[in-house]
Regions:
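Divalent-cation
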Residues: 166, 175-178, 190
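Short beta-strand-centered segment that lines the nucleotide-binding/catalytic pocket of NTP-utilizing
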Residues: 156-171
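Short, polar loop motifs at secondary-structure junctions
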Residues: 7-12, 187-192
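Glycine-rich phosphate-binding P-loop
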Residues: 120, 128-154
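Short, small-residue-biased leader/transition segments that mark boundaries at the very start
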Residues: 1-3
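N-terminal pre-Walker A segment at the start of P-loop NTPase domains
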Residues: 91-125
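A glycine- and Lys/Arg-enriched "phosphate-lid" helix/loop adjacent to the NTP-binding pocket
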Residues: 18-61, 197-244
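Intrinsic-disorder/low-complexity recognition with aromatic hotspots
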Residues: 59, 63-94, 251-275
Length: 275
């Protein structure tokens, strides 16, 4: 059983409406006559906040492309081997196989996000579950390779893990938590440093070929400068979108019958209790 909030930023269409899924029409809770005088203001706010969201997404997409370019610039077989070797050493030291245990399981959870308040990461959530923290100092977005090896090794050793994808590239790992061992691997960067005291700190940048890094430095500086500017623009657009969305809610709020909303919720709860 799942109840989904369907709005313009979370559009989910039913596959089998009427037999598996059904719509819940909260539009019936509006005072349509009272809202008629707000038509122009509502349309203006609706268009405005959508426009800010679209601009934010364009900036984030562009920033993600530049991040990919940085990673591609530094990628090499030698880098892969160095990170793989480092991961194997950690696995041998920290993740001893559990005798007789089945393979571990994976839960995926986002630990960070880009919001109207800026880039955020719930470091405190990690510290509530894990006391030993490996900080992967990662200026160029290289942590995924090491984390992928650690994830695979942890599962084979019989440990359950929480894999935390990057909000900028959800197909790439950014953090890895192993609560059974009170152990976490967190990637950090100058733009988003880990504020706590790490059990160990690994400098992933040192795995890059010094010659390649030297030759690529102007390109890397340019990409990171533009990426930072794009992220700032995205956050600014999200902030403006949030402000306009708040204005939109303020327009609607006096014309919503919240008693009817509550009645609808109670009716749904009664249906669920019969399942």
């Amino acid at each position: 059983m799942c109840i989904r909030d369907r709005d313009n930023t979370h559009v989910v269409e039913p596959k089998y409406p009427g037999v598996v899924e059904q719509y819940i029409n909260l539009g019936k809770c509006y005072d349509h006559n009272g809202m008629e005088g707000l038509r122009t203001a509502i349309i203006s706010c609706m268009r405005g906040y959508k426009g800010h969201y679209q601009r934010a997404y364009r900036c984030l997409d562009a920033a993600a492309e530049l991040m990919y370019d940085v990673r591609s610039t530094l990628d090499s077989d030698a880098l892969e081997e160095k990170l793989s070797k480092r991961a194997r050493g950690i696995l041998d030291r920290e993740l001893k196989p559990r005798k007789g245990a089945p393979a571990g399981t994976v839960k995926q959870r986002f630990l960070g996000a880009v919001t109207h308040r800026g880039q955020m990461c719930l470091w405190g959530t990690v510290e509530c579950q894990c006391q030993r923290i490996y900080e992967l100092s990662d200026r160029y977005g290289l942590a995924h390779r090491m984390l992928a090896h650690l994830l695979s090794g942890a599962l084979k050793a019989g440990y359950d893990v929480v894999a935390c994808p990057s909000p900028m590239a959800p197909d790439r790992l950014e953090h890895l938590l192993i609560p059974q061992l009170s152990l976490a691997f967190l990637s950090s960067s100058p733009a988003h440093p880990y504020p706590g005291k790490a059990y160990r700190r690994l400098l992933l940048d040192n795995a890059v070929s010094a010659d390649l890094l030297r030759r690529s430095r102007p390109r890397l500086r340019f990409s990171q400068k533009i990426t930072s500017a794009l992220m700032d623009e995205a956050v600014d657009s999200l902030s403006q979108a949030k402000a306009m969305h708040d204005d939109l809610e303020a327009l609607y709020h006096p014309y919503v019958n919240f008693e009817l909303v509550d009645e609808t919720a109670l009716a749904i709860a009664a249906e669920l209790s019969l399942l």
